[in-house]
């Protein structure tokens, strides 16, 4: 199984935008090389999470080893390392590219280059990978291979004269792709004699074996039973099981430089074997780890609360289990006066947040209330201390802080030119600064904006898609923190601030947001027995208010005629009762009210 010389190993990945046919192409490669028998074949073979198949995206990385006999009658081993295509998971992409020597750049021949593909191609170029352009879906009636070739040449600067025309669905061009992987992708360097260094590019939690780590051996050899050390976390483990992914797991006794495989070593949590960490032998350690390890930092935060307070322990267990599989997920307990006990969770981006929420609800049967997403603000206090705050309710008062800075991102949008106007409006309305605009090919344009991340995390992506009828695509990356006149907007219901409705907003937008919020809450909160004032305030200054009138019983119904003082006495008595009720009564804020905060920005 592992006696193939290094010169006949090829490690490659597939770079493609969502829906450009990456998973189908991977299926065809597995089928053509006979790695997966036809009867076991199912659509999207490598996307084995139910959610991935449903959304048609790749979330967790997969790897597969294929044996292939090339036209020169030699047997080769091709290791496909699958990458997630979504912008939230770009760190995972960079690690899996670091484990390869080549990449297939798959572009839909009817759509052309999209923004996410660009971001990943630039990562591949940084890692010095050999890039093979493949134009997929050429069987579609709308395919324009010549236009797309020109587009790739102009945007990415790759020579497309040898681009492969393929259709993963019908199997056209698959043999050519396999041949070009063998002939164009360089073999790994033969460094079997060096001390062991292996790069972790993925890990997942298995109920019986603990964490199973996927890795690529860069230097040296690893054998079953070796004691290994993970350089970033400093932990040591014994390798109980070692194997290759074909794409199901097949055990082997040793793996040498250039190979891709997995090992299990009774590791308790994925945090101990983080993506990007370097594996080395405990007794013969490598001098330095492989470059490029970064701890994935959450960018978007939100509160998660169970609708039923009794489900709090279940939510905690569910988060612990997801955390085993997802080192980028952060959470800590928090309490809210309105919603009881819950967790403050951190995510890589909006898609990551949605996926975690959906997995909690689907796999663990939880009903959750999610607060509005927020980002990490940097606050400098008057004493000169720097605080990082992800929850608006923990923002210090204005008299204690010198300045607030918020994270900014650069957003690159690629769009057909007829939507440029509406997308520029969108950029301006989100406090964006226009930076650049290039015409890629006739009819397609790229727009570059700098925006506060807070404006991107709410619903920027959805708005961009709806304004461009789904044709535009975007990618964003962090460019640093900038100072802005930000204020904390508090919502008071019956004179009590509701911490889960608080938000940090730009001063110029505060009145508009406050006004919109209170009028929305007025519609959503049901009437009570007493009058409920709803106010939006900045500090002690109320900037907008509405009130919900009381429900009242007609206490005069049984007075027929009679003295006016009798009626007055009954009305006074009712008034006193309402007053007492108002001072002790609690207002129930329904779940829809919290969701309203998320939607205010759309209107």
From Swiss-Prot:
It catalyses: GTP + H2O = GDP + phosphate + H(+). Signal peptide: none annotated. The keyword Transcription does not apply. Residues 7-189 form the tr-type G domain. GTP binds at residues 19-24, 136-139. It is an enzyme of class 3 (hydrolase). It is found in: Cell inner membrane. Its EC number is 3.6.5.n1. Required for accurate and efficient protein synthesis under certain stress conditions. May act as a fidelity factor of the translation reaction, by catalyzing a one-codon backward translocation of tRNAs on improperly translocated ribosomes. Back-translocation proceeds from a post-translocation (POST) complex to a pre-translocation (PRE) complex, thus giving elongation factor G a second chance to translocate the tRNAs correctly. Binds to ribosomes in a GTP-dependent manner. PANTHER family: TRANSLATION FACTOR GUF1 HOMOLOG, CHLOROPLASTIC (PTHR43512:SF4), TRANSLATION FACTOR GUF1-RELATED (PTHR43512). This is Elongation factor 4. It comes from Acaryochloris marina (strain MBIC 11017).
